[in-house]
Amino acid sequence: MAASSAIGSSPAAPNIAWNETQRRFETEDKKAYVEYVLRQDGKVMDIVHTFVPSSKRGLGLASHLCVAAFNHAKSHSLSVITSCSYVSDTFLPRNPSWNSLLYSEEPRSNI
């Protein structure tokens, strides 16, 4: 069953939908997206690919897609692995507040 729910709906932010069936977050036109794989029995979201077509680059879409993915991980108590180089090399250095969700083999405290 495909689940699609709007993540961002403010005028400044594009509408990003969670496509559960295809395991990705995507723009309304489905042309820009972040793909993920669930690991560790569904407890870890591995973000494996970010794509924005050349005609839409420079608009901040990749960042909006990543925020949607990290918000989803946070609200579902998932840790995140960043196999995608955009996420690890560009998004996280610019948005270090998300580092707390990164997967670690050490148990996390719930404090």
Where do the model's predicted regions map?
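Short secondary-structure capping/turn micro-motifs that flank functional sites
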Residues: S88-T90
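Short, hinge-like loop/turn segments at secondary-structure boundaries
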Residues: S97-L101
